[in-house]
Amino acid sequence: MTSRFEPFAALLLAWAFGAPQVLAHTAGHPGHAHHAAHAGTQQTAGAARSVLPFDETTWAQLLSQGPRPAAYLFTTSYCSTCPAAFAVLHDAVKGRTARPPLNAVMMDVAGPQALRHAAHFKGMSQMYAFDGFEPAIRQAVDPAWPNVTPYVVLVDAKGQTQRVIGPPSPQMLRRWLSAP
């Protein structure tokens, strides 16, 4: 039985995800609002349609062999300020012809649960999720990290890192993007 509120739910999902395909998908099928929500998340996620594992060895590999420059935002599913910090990163690179990768690393959820949060990170290149013992992974990233999010690491073209809790300052962003 279809509820009289399901058409409204479909419209609300379309507005929340900013995805015209949600409206198209739900037209004539108001009972499919749940599937429409996931379709909108997948479309909004852009390139990040999968979640890569991030274990104790991943950070060293990314620093030695990963793209440069690049940004990594370490976040949790309940971090209310992380999307705003990611928006600062996205705003810093969106006018550039060669955009550095902007990556999100989920610390508390993986797989489809992590992908549900992809819509919060507009412009994200890749999503990772902790895979292993969280304290050991954090230790591998930064032994001084006090387990506070958002935790942002900017890797410049030379492989030098800048680390900050919260959004990076304009000076940090300039230094990150101007390194030869």
Over which residues does each language-model region extend?
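N-terminal targeting signals for export/organelle localization
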Residues: M1-P53, Q160-R163, R174-R175, P180
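A short beta-strand-turn-helix
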Residues: A48-P69
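Short active-site neighborhood of thiol/selenol oxidoreductases, capturing the structured segment around
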Residues: S64-S80
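The canonical Cys-X-X-Cys-His
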Residues: C79-P83, V152
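Typically the conserved alpha-helix immediately C-terminal to a functionally engaged Cys/Sec
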Residues: P83-R96
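Thiol-based oxidoreductase modules, predominantly thioredoxin-like and allied folds used
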Residues: R99-A114, G123-F133
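Structural alpha/beta surface segment adjacent to cysteine/selenocysteine redox centers
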Residues: P112-Q126, Q139-N147
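Thiol/disulfide oxidoreductase modules built on the thioredoxin-like
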Residues: D131-W176
